[in-house]
Amino acid sequence: MLHPDRNFSTIASQGLAVEQVMAQLEHAKTGALLAGEPARRALFCDADTCVEPLEVRRTLHVEPTGSIEADELRPWLKAPASGDGLRVVVNEGAGPYLCRPAQMGADIAVEDLGDLFGEAFEGLAFVAARSGGALERFLRAIGAGALDAAAPVLPGVRDLLAHMLSQLALVTQTRCDRALVAAQFLAHHPRVVWVRYPGLAEDASNAEARRSMEHGFGWRVTFKPAEDARGFACGLWEGPLGALSSRVEVLPDGACVLHTGLEEALDVVGALEKGIACPKPTEDCA
């Protein structure tokens, strides 16, 4: 069972290597590891579904509708919260900012560990707080008490999580590096209409990103192929490139979002180049 642990001295009785976690997350002062329903509530909380006012900002997060709001492309956003709401940033694709809510002008930062480390960690969320009081307020707002936050986790997943967290800095930097290379490739491809990624020099947000994002620019790249996006993407989905593999999702407006994994940069670029050059016929896509 995994329980929130506010001091990181232990995470319930799982025996996770918390010292290794803290070695990578030096900016984290207090936080919680959530599983099951409490994790879901933390990742999808908003002012309408929680007990108390929350001002939720999503960073590099693509909504199910496919819309991408301006805030979602600005993980370094530091705008003040309105009223007395608890400022919450849900990090999906902004791994360098895990456990650094203060840098983003937030009280709480929530990271989807499934998005960070792959399918083996689906259903787990990591919550970092500016203070113990902010963490307590957030857990109360999402209705997650110490006992309620418990959920069964397979022992193998537990051990793998401890290892992955100890490698967090390397994992996040690698994925960000791959995303930057992919974005640069896509930005200069004649069959790509536009690319949005804060690490690109020509991106409107690049100047602010370089001032505020010293550990990388996230691992999601949004772009618009000139041809049918669904045929391009479904060809890539046929063969995952690795354990934490890059993938492309298609938005309703025909744009695509690349989620980079841990493959070699040349493999990611090669897969994109092949997909753009030889998209599958739309009728062959499920």
Predicted regions: what is each one?
Residues 7-10, 67-68, 73-75, 171, ...:
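PLP-dependent enzyme catalytic core of the Aspartate aminotransferase-like
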Residues 102, 131-133, 226-228, 263-265:
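Generic structural motif
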Residues 163-164, 180-254:
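Conserved small-domain helix->loop->beta segment predominantly found in fold-type I
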